[in-house]
Each structure stands twice: as C-alpha cells, then as structure tokens.
C-alpha cells in the first residue's frame, strides 16, 4: 500500500505559478519545501492569467475528494484577485465584479472537496500594483489606459480580508500591506504618511514598488521573501522548534532507525 505525503498546495494565478522560479536568489516554493522536507510535498497549482471564475470552473478537477490512496491536503494557500481586478475594457477579458469575486472566494474556501481534507487555509490578499509602471506597459501593449489601478486592486485585497473574517476556518495573510510597507521602507522619502500611495499617479513616485514589482504586477525575489515571512509562522509550527535529531512528522523513518 502506498503512503502518499500530505500536501501543501499553492493555488492561484501567476503570482503563485512564478513562486516555483528562482528570482534574485530566492524561490518561495523551494523555501516552503525545505521547511516541510520529508513531512509534506509542496504542490504548485498556480495558473497564469486565471481569475476566481476560472478557478471555480475547474476546482472539482484540481481538488479531488480525499481517498485512502490519495494525499491529504494539510495546508492550502490561496492567492487570487490580481486578474479579477482588471478593468473591463474592450481590450481586456479577465474582470470579475467585486461582489462576484467575494462570492467566488467564499465558494473556494468552502468547497466540499477542500473541506473534506480539513486543511489549514491561508487566504492571501493580492499585493498592491504599481499603476505608474503598468500604465507605461499597458499603453505599449495597445490598451487605452492602465488595465489595473491601485485603488481598484486595493478594494479586491480588502475583499479577500473580508472573506477571511467571515470564515473562522480561514487565516488572512495580508500581503498587500506587507508589500506596501516594504516599499515605503525602501524609499521613505517618496511617501508621506496619509498621502497618496506609492505607484499612484497622485504620488508620482514608484518608490520601492519599482524594485518589488518590476513590471508593476509580478513580484521579484524580495517580494516573495516577504510572502514567505508571512506564511512561515502558520506552517510547520509543530516541528520547526524540535531538536534537529527529532524526526516527528517524517512519513518514512530516518536512516539511523533503519540502521538500528
């Protein structure tokens, strides 16, 4: 009989798909796998370009019902919304209205196939965007304006927080605030507390977002390090403080046990 490893699943859009890559010397997926080595398999189910409507359409196929022969999902990290927040224009197709986004997120974190695994669900807010950089790139791509704005994207992040608040079994991971705080810390002279945010036309400065979000949307290695720092306290608490020789949680025995 096979003994499949429990899983930590990363479910979302390109922000999680790209977490498998090594960027600026850091890979989020690799860091999580190292933290969970021999105890959990880290599975990447990030789909570039997807919104919550796409996720709902395929969720039954992505998350099968648990069975004796299939792995149990112990942790589920969900990060969706960056594409839902795309402005509806003749040149765009990804927009999901805010209220529907909320319903979709709620349906995902309460899907019966997922709940049957009884995972710890970590719902990550979409990060901020650098609207100044996005406008440059989007105009060059033929769009009439930036297809994402800081204000609209922030409203989707707040909705993700609300979904977590509404569901006691869901943990909120506030990536939006953490990335913005990091960007401000990198360039404090370009932001005044209470004033327009970095990356907005009203501010006029990209600040630290220019480093953390090189194309205005996708994260660099330092931004993924921020996300790792947010996830880490919720994953592996039961073994990270153990002595190095303690193999609690290993699915298969340590070689010393076999040698004995």
Give the ranges of each region predicted by the language model.
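Serine-esterase "nucleophile elbow" of acetyl-processing enzymes
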Residues: 1-54, 59-71, 76, 240
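Alpha-helical cap/lid subdomain in secreted, periplasmic
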Residues: 31, 57-260
């Amino acid at each position: 009989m096979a003994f499949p490893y429990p899983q930590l699943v990363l479910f979302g859009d390109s922000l999680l798909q790209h977490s498998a890559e090594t960027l600026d010397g850091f890979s989020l997926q690799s860091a999580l796998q190292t933290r969970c080595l021999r105890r959990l398999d880290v599975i990447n189910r990030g789909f570039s370009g997807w919104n919550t409507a796409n996720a709902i359409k395929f969720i039954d196929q992505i998350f099968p019902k648990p069975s004796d022969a299939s792995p149990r999902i112990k942790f589920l990290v969900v990060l969706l919304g960056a594409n839902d927040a795309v402005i509806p224009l003749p040149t765009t197709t990804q927009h999901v209205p805010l209220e529907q986004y909320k319903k979709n997120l709620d349906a995902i974190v309460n899907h019966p196939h997922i709940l049957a695994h009884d995972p710890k669900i970590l719902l990550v807010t979409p990060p901020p965007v650098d609207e100044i950089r996005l406008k440059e790139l989007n105009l060059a791509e033929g769009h009439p304006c930036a297809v994402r704005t800081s204000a609209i994207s922030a409203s989707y992040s707040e909705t993700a927080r609300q979904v977590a608040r509404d569901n006691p079994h869901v943990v909120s991971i506030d990536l939006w605030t953490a990335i913005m705080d990091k960007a401000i810390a990198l360039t404090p002279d370009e932001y005044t507390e209470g004033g327009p945010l970095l990356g907005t036309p009203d501010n006029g400065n990209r600040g630290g977002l220019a480093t953390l979000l090189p194309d205005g949307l996708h994260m660099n290695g330092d931004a993924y390090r921020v996300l790792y720092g947010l996830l880490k306290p919720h994953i592996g608490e039961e073994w990270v403080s153990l002595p190095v020789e303690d193999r609690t949680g290993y699915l298969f025995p340590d070689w010393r046990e076999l040698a004995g």
